[in-house]
Amino acid sequence: CVFAETLTNPSLVVTDLELFAERAHAHGVPLIVDNTFPTPVNCRPFEFGADIATHSTTKYMDGHATQIGGVIVDSGHFDWANGKFPMLTQPDESYHGIVYTEAFGKAAYITKARVHLMRDIGAQAAPMNAFLLNLGLETLALRMQRHCENALAVAKYLENNPKVSWVNYPCLPTNPYHER
């Protein structure tokens, strides 16, 4: 698997997801992208070839850091039966010999992730955490718009301040990643 962040933390490098996806797929492996920083509001990695997107829900999605969590989202486009993932193409004795690629097709990975994580480590939100996350998701689009507007205003102010030697913000036209 190839792992990347859409927007790296803390350096704010904007990853060329199309290039990463092309290279990963040329080798028969998926591109898994941490999309925590931009959220799905500002970047939809599947549109650039990513196969799996992950998000820390504790940050922007929650909005208040009141719960701890994360999500895994599968695009449903990757061929998990290509011979490189025996844990998906061979019988899983812990689930009565099921072969995930045969039973679930392109949803093999996300199904295995879900059933194994819930069974083995209980990776499931408590009801209150789910409620708090849902509250944050209801205002995510509006909050992200405001975050971006405010960040750009601050970056422009700092860029024009003679006491500041440089500003690294991808939305500034002077930033090398501005076009991505």
Question: At which residue positions do the language-model features occur?
Answer:
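A compositional/biophysical signature of low hydrophobicity enriched in polar/charged and small residues
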Residues: 156-180
